Amino acid sequence: MARYRGPRLRVIRRLGDLPGLTRKAVPSRRAYPPGQHGQARKKRSEYAMRLEEKQKLRFNYGLTERQLVRYVRRARRVSGSTGLALLQLLEMRLDNIIFRLGMAPTIPAARQLVNHGHVTVNGRVVSIPSYQCRPGNEIGIRNKENSRRLAEENLKFPGLANLPTHLELDKNKLMAKVNSVVEREWVALQVNELLVVEYYSRKV
């Protein structure tokens, strides 16, 4: 399944606010799923609820189904909570770190910054959005006028207001440091990760 490139408002009307996908919130007068029967009240099955939580992760972080399956498999190999490990793997992606630092308004915009070679990790250009950041990594913006201008403009209007505690940022130098792995309380997406793990329990 390919990465979604369609209308974002349609997605958030179905799934709720997805801070990584768009700054737009669900309009209160249209806070129901799209389509002819969007306003009909239905009792959702357990499968439908698990699927919805899985879709929140996929759309918020901009993943294909195949990519998400790989992350679930990696999370299962980590000791402790599989759901928490899954969220931490996704939150520590380079594109998400750039988004959480406020250097891009959304994760798709952050992915574009990384793809175009504007971002460095430990002083070297990294153009892979899925690069897994680790504690101790130094994240920066390439010392080029165009790169710095893009980041500086985005920092004026960050997608999320609060910088999570596992990151520190020097706005003047456009340099940041990953101090630790993200804690669950700092995951901005409202999602039940246990339902996601249950969704894949028989599929992966």
From Swiss-Prot:
Q: Does the keyword Secreted apply?
A: no
The record's listing under NCBIfam families reads:
PRK05327.1, rpsD_bact
Q: What keywords appear on the UniProt entry?
A: Ribonucleoprotein, Ribosomal protein, RNA-binding, rRNA-binding
Q: Which residues cross the membrane?
A: none
Report domain S4 RNA-binding positions. 92-152
**Where do the record's region annotations for Disordered lie?**
25-45
Q: What does this protein do?
A: One of the primary rRNA binding proteins, it binds directly to 16S rRNA where it nucleates assembly of the body of the 30S subunit.
Q: Which PANTHER family match?
A: 30S 40S RIBOSOMAL PROTEIN, SMALL RIBOSOMAL SUBUNIT PROTEIN US4M
Organism domain of life = Bacteria
Q: Select a single GO molecular function from the record's annotations and give it.
A: structural constituent of ribosome
Q: Which GO terms describe its cellular component?
A: small ribosomal subunit
Protein name, UniProt field: Small ribosomal subunit protein uS4
Its GO biological process annotations read:
ribosomal small subunit biogenesis; translation
A Pfam family annotated for this chain is: S4
